[in-house]
Amino acid sequence: MESNNVEEVTDKFGGCLSLDTEKMGKYDRYRQKGKEAALNGELPRALELFQLAYQLQPSEKLKKRIQAIQDLIQREDEEDEEEEEEFVNVNNSGLKLYKGLYDKLYDHQKEGVAFLYSLYRDGRKGGILADDMGLGKTIQVISFLSGMYDAELANHTLLVMPTSLIKNWVREFAKWTPGMRVKEFHGSSKTERNRNLERIQRKGGVIITTYQMLINNYEQLGSNGHREFKWDYVILDEAHKIKTSSTKTAKSAHAIPAKNRVLLTGTPVQNNLREMWALFDFACQGSLLGTSKTFKTEYENPITRAREKDATPGEKALGLRISQNLTDIIKPYFLRRTKADVQQKKLKLEEGFEEEEDQENKCPNAREGVEMPSLTRKNDLIVWTYLSSVQEDIYNKFISLDQIKELLTTTRSPLAELTVLKKLCDHPRLLSQRAVIQLGLERGSDSELVHSDESESAVSQIDNISDHTLIEESGKLQFVVSLMECLREEGHRTLIFSQSRKMLDIMERVLRNRNFRLLRLDGTVTQLAEREKRISLFQTDKRYTIFLLTTQVGGVGITLTGANRVVIFDPSWNPATDAQAVDRAYRIGQTENVIIYRLITCGTVEEKIYRRQVFKDSLIRQTTGDKKNPFRYFSKQELRELFKLEDTRSSSTQQQLQAMHAQSRRSDTSLDHHIARLHSMEMFGISDHDLMFTKEPAADEDDPEDAESHHYIQTRVQKAQELMQAESELHGQLLDSMAQNTEPAWLRQMGQPNSSIRDRPAPPRIKNEPVTVDLTHNSFDEPEFEEDEQNLPSAEDAEMETASEDVEVIGDEDLGDKVISSEVEVVGEEVEVVAEEVEDAGEVEVVSEEVEGVGVEVEDVGVEVEDAGVEVEDAGVEVEDAGVEVEDAGEVEVVSGEGQVQPKSPQSGGEWNLQIVKTEVSPIAEKFADVITLDDTSDEADSSDFNTESKQQNSSQRFQSPSLQFPKLDDLSGASNTLGNEEVEPEKCHSQVLSSPLSQHEATTDEPFKAEMEMPHGNFNLLLEDSADMYFPEDEEVHEVEESAAEESPEFQLQMDVSGERLEEPSINHDKQNNGEFVNYNDSEVSKRESLLKIRSTPNESVDDSFVHSVRTKKRQVISDTEEEEEEEEESEKPCLTSSPFIDAISRLGSSTPKAVLVDGARLRRSLNASVASRRSFVVSLLENESDEESNEDKTKSSGASETCADELVEEVQTSSGDNSKSYETSEANGTLADELVEEEGEYREGKNTSDKVSESNETHSEEFAEEEKPSGDKSESYEISEASETHTDNSEEEIIGDHTGSYKISESSEADESVVEEEEPSGETLNTEESEMGEEEESAELIAGQEQEEWHSAVLESTGDVELDSNETMDQCAPKTVPVETHVLPVSSTNTAAEASDNKYNLLVLSGKQSLAEGRKQEALDFFLKAIDINTGDPEIQLLIIQLYRQLSQ
C-alpha cells in the first residue's frame, strides 16, 4: 500500500515538475523576446509579450516594467501629435530644429546653422565658421548638433578646444540641449577619461577634450579597441591652433578619422595665407586648395606682393584677381560675419533694404523671433608713449652692439634680439638679473654677477625697489598709473593685458600699493575651477576695478563684459592676438561703450611691429572677404628697419594716421573730454586704430594697364585654379586608396601585449651590407624641410606621399640574389621567422607613431638603428616601397602547431597584413622598438651572427615574395615538460616566475638576434621605435618572456579554432553599427588581442639563458598622458579602492572636470521624438537618475531573497550560455524600464563572448546552478564572477577576460562610483554580484580553498574603458606575482534572510581584514575593510582602522 502511495505521489510530483518546467520555459521565452522587442523600439510588441509573461508568473519587477512601457507608449503618442509644431526648418535648408531652441537664435546664428547643415547636405567634407569673436559660434554649433542628433544624421562628435573653454562649453550644452549626452575627456583621472570616451563611442554623444589631450592621446581618440573609429564630426574651437601644419597639434588632429570636420575661429588668418591653407587642408581633408607649395606659388606670393605700398600696377592687378578667385573657391566652405556686418545688416533691415549676398542661407523671417541686440560703440585708440630716459639709454647701447651689426649682415633670425628690444620698451627690469646689474640699475657684487642666472628676470628682485623707481623707469607704466587713477574717478572697470607675467607682477605691486582692488589670471592658475571663480567674481563684484591678464590665457574664449575699458600694454606681432583680447569686453552682452588703449612707444621696434600688424590686417581683410581691396599704408622695405631707433619724442606713423583719420572718429562730449585729459598725461599723441582701412583706394588703381596685361592675368588665374584643382583631386584619390588599403600603425600594434625590461639590448650587427630605408618623413619631432622652410606639409599629406620614400641599399656588390643573414638568439633559443610566398607581392607599409607626450627620439635614446640595417631618424616613421605591396590586407590564421601563418580566405589573394614582433630597448631611454624580420626558410643555412660592416654603397632595391611565420620556440627551459600533448599548467609557469632569480632577467649581450630573410632583389631588417604608451613601468620589475608554450598541443589548436569560429560570427563585436563607423582591419582567426609571441632581447646581463613562461594579465593601456612614469608606477602598485565610499568623492576632487549629470540616448529620441534641446528631455534625464537610484536601493534590499535571485541568476546564465544574439545598447529611457532592461545587458555580452563555453562559478550558489554551468567540452575552465561595487546604474556591463589556459574572469563594472579595479585583487578574496550573494551561505569553505590557487592565477580585471577581449585573448599581468595567502573563510549555514547573509559576509570580510593586517598586508587589509564598511557603515572600529591604514599607506 505504501509503495502504491509513494508511486502515486511521485507521479503527481513529476507531473507538477514537468508542468512547472514547461511554464517556466514559456515565461522565459516571453520575457526574453519582450526585452529584445523593447530594445529594438517595438514597444507595443514588447508590452504584449511582457503581459503574457506576467500572466504566467506575476512579479513586482515585471509589473514595473509593463507600467514603464505603457508610459513610454503614451508619451510617444502625445509627441507624435506635437511633432510638426515642435520642429522648424532652419532657413529652408532642410534641417529641422527644435522650435524652443530655434526661437532663441538671432538671425545671423540661424544662417550659421543653415551654413553648417549645407556642408553636410551638399557632401562637403568640412568647412570653417569664422564669425567674429562674440557673435555666438558656440550656440550655432550646439544648435546644429541638436538638429543633427534629433534627425539621427550624426551620433558621435569630438569637440577639441583650449582648456579654459571646457567649462563654458559644458555649461552651454546643459543650457541649450540638456538631453544630449556630453562627456569630458579631460582631467587627472585616466579611468574616468577612458570610461567617458568608451561610453560616447558606444552609445553616441559629444566628447569634449583639449588640444593637449589630443596630442597625448590621438591614438585612443582615433580608435575603439582594435579598429579605427571614425567620428561623425570633429569640431575644433579656436582652430587657429592648427594654423601651422607641421606642429604636433596639427598632426594629431589630422590623425583623427572623421567623416566631417568643422573649424571655429574668429581669426582664420593671423600672419600669412599659409595659415589659412592649413585650416582648409584640415577641414576639407586636402580636397580644396591643393598642396602647400602650389598654393604659396600661385596664390600667396601674388596676393602678398600686391598688398605692399610700392607694388607695381600689374602686381596689384594680378594680386586682386588672384584674391578674388581664391575667395570664390573657398566661399562654399567658409562663413565669416563681423560685428560691423551684423550691425549694418540689422540697420538695413530696419530701413527696408534687402541683402543680396548669401541668399542660400539667408533667414526668410529675419524680422521675426529674437532681435539681435545692438552692439555698443567701440573706440580703439593707439596711445603713443615715450621711453623713459633709462629705457632710451639702454636701447641705444643695445642696438649699437657688434652683435646687432653682425646680425644685420646675416640671414639668421633676429627673434631673440627683437624680444630683448620689446622687453626694453615695456620695462628694463624685464631683462635678466645679470643684465640689470651690468647696466647699473641695481647694485650688486661681482660674486652676484658671476653666479646670477642668465635666464632669471630682475622682477624677482624688486622687493627692495621703491614704487617710484619702478614707475620712473618705464614710460608706459607712468601712463598706466595715471590712466588707472583717471578711470577710477570716472567709475570705469578695466582689463589690462600683457604678454609678460613679470610685467603683470610689477603692475600688480604698484597698483595694489595705490589701493586698487584687482584680480589676476595667468598661466600659473592651472585649475579650471579657480579660473572660473576669478572670472565670475570680476563679472559680479563691481568692487574689483582692474583685472590683470596675460594675452595667451585671458585672451581666448572668455567673457568679461563687466569691464568697459581695455589696456593692451604691449602689442603682439599677430594682430589677431590683440583682437582676441579686445573682444573679451566688446561682445554681445556689453551694455556700455568700450574704449581700447593700445600702448606703443614712439620710434621703437613696437612702432615697426604695429606697422607690420596693419600690413597683415590688410591681407586678412582682403582674403576673408571683409574688404576686396584694402588701403595700402606701408611698404615692405619699411618693415625691415627694426633695429633703428628713430625720434623717441614723436611718431611718424601717428602723424600719418592722424592726418588721414582724425576727422572720422566717432565721438561724443564725454569721449572728447576724456581724450583731452589723456593728452595731459605723459604721452605723445593718439591715433584711431578702429578707423584703419576706412579710406578707399583710387578706383582705377588696380586696373591692368593694357589688354595684354589683362590677358596675362586671366591666363595666370585660370592656370592657378586648374593646377590646384588637379592636385586636390589627386590627393582625394590617394586618400580613398589609403582608406581602403591601410590602417593606422597603432591599430596593428595595440593588439600585442608588451612588457618592458630594465636593460638595453645591444644593437644588432649584420655581416652583409644593410639595406637602409629613409624613414625621416612625417616626423613628429623634427621639422620637415622643403624648398621653402615655411612650406610644411600636413601630417596627412606626409602619409600620402608614398612615392617620395626611397630605399637605399648600402653595399659594394649587388644584393639582388644574396641573403642578408642575421641571427636572433633569445636566451638560448633559436627563433625562426619564415613567411609564405605571396603571389601579388608589393608594398609593405609599417607605421610606428610616437606618443606625443613622450617626445623622445631614437637618436636621443642612443640606439644605433643604422647598424640594424635601417636608418630611423624619428619616432613617427612610415616605411613605404619597402618591398611588399599589400593592397587589401588579408587575414591570418594559426592553423597548426608550428604556428605558420596562412591566408584565411581565398578571396584575400594571398595578401598580408604583417604583424610586428616587438623587441625591447633600454628603459634608460624608456623607449621601445619594433623588429620586423623577414627570411626564407630555404636559406636557413646562410644565417650567421651579426657583424658590423662599413656602409659603402647605396642603391634602391625591391623584393616581391617574402615569407612570414610566427616565431616559435622549440623548447622552453622552464616549462619543457608542459609541451607536447600536455596542457600548460599556469601554476608551473608562475612557480617558474617566483623561483627565477633576478639574474634570469639578465641576458648576455653576446647573443644577438637571429633572423633570416631573402628577397629576389634585396634584404633588410627594420628596427623601428615603438610607442611607449602601451607599456607599463611596473613590468620592469619582472622580466618574463612570453610565448605560446602550448601551441603544439591539441588543446592549443582547439582553442584557436574555436576562437576563429567565434570571430566569424556576426555577433562577435558588441558595438552596434549605428554607433559609429568602424573599419575592422584584419579580422583574424588569431584575435588581435591574442598574446602574440614575443621575442625579448635582454643583453648586458648574466649568461642564464633559461626561458620563463607565464600567463600574465595586463591592463590594456591606450592613453598616454603627461604624468611622469614614476607616478604611473606608484599608482600601479596600489589597488584601486573601488568599493570605498570615499573614493568617488576623492576622484571628483582630484579631477578638475567633474562629469556632466544630464545624459540622454539616441534611442530615447527615436522612441519619443523628443529633441535633446527640449525640456522634456531634461525631465526624462532626471527621472532616469531617480529611478536608477530607487532601483539600486531595491536591489540592495532584495538581495536576501536567495531563492528568487538564484533562479534569476540561473536564468541569466542559461541565456548567456546559449544565446549568440547580437549585443545591444540600452536607451536611457524613463522609469525603471531602462534600469531593468540594462540589467540584462551583461547576458548578451557574456553570451556573445563565451558562446558555447559556459562558465563555472568558483562560488557555487546552488547545486542546480553549478550543474547548469558545466562547460560543454571536457576542458575545465574556471571563472570568477566579481563586482566592482555594490551600487549599480543602468550602464553596468560584463566583460570576459581570458588567458592562455582558458581561465577566465567575469567582472562587472559599476558606473555609479566611476572607479575600476586596475590591479590584481588580493589573493583568496571573492567578490559576488547581487544575485550570487544569496547562494553564498551554501558554499563550503573547502570549495573556496580549492579554487584559491586558480583565482590567484587570473586577476580580477575591471573595465577601464577598453573593449572586452574575446574568449581566446589574453592580457599581460602588470604587477609582479606574489605568493597567495590563504584567506580564512568561515562556512555559513543556509539561511533565507538578507540580514543574516549580510552579517555573515560582513564578519567574513572583517576577519579576513584583521588576518591580513596581522600578517602585515596593509593594502589587502584596507580592501577588506572598505568592502565591510560598505555593508555596515556605522562600525566605528572599522572606520578607525580604515583611517589609520590610509595614513600609513599614504606615507
From Swiss-Prot:
It is found in: Chromosome, Centromere; Chromosome, Centromere, Kinetochore; Chromosome. ATP binds at residues 131-138. Keywords: ATP-binding, Cell cycle, Cell division, Centromere, Chromosome, DNA-binding, Helicase, Hydrolase, Kinetochore, Mitosis, Nucleotide-binding, Phosphoprotein, Repeat, TPR repeat. Residues 944-964, 992-1002, 1213-1230 have a biased composition (Polar residues). Residues 1063-1074, 1244-1278 have a biased composition (Basic and acidic residues). Residues 479-639 form the Helicase C-terminal domain. TPR repeats lie at residues 27-60, 1402-1435. InterPro entries: Helicase_ATP-bd (IPR014001), Helicase_C-like (IPR001650), Intein_N (IPR006141), P-loop_NTPase (IPR027417), SNF2-like_sf (IPR038718), SNF2/RAD54-like_C (IPR049730), SNF2_N (IPR000330), SNF2_RAD54_helicase_repair (IPR050496). Belongs to the SNF2/RAD54 helicase family. This is DNA excision repair protein ERCC-6-like. It comes from Danio rerio.
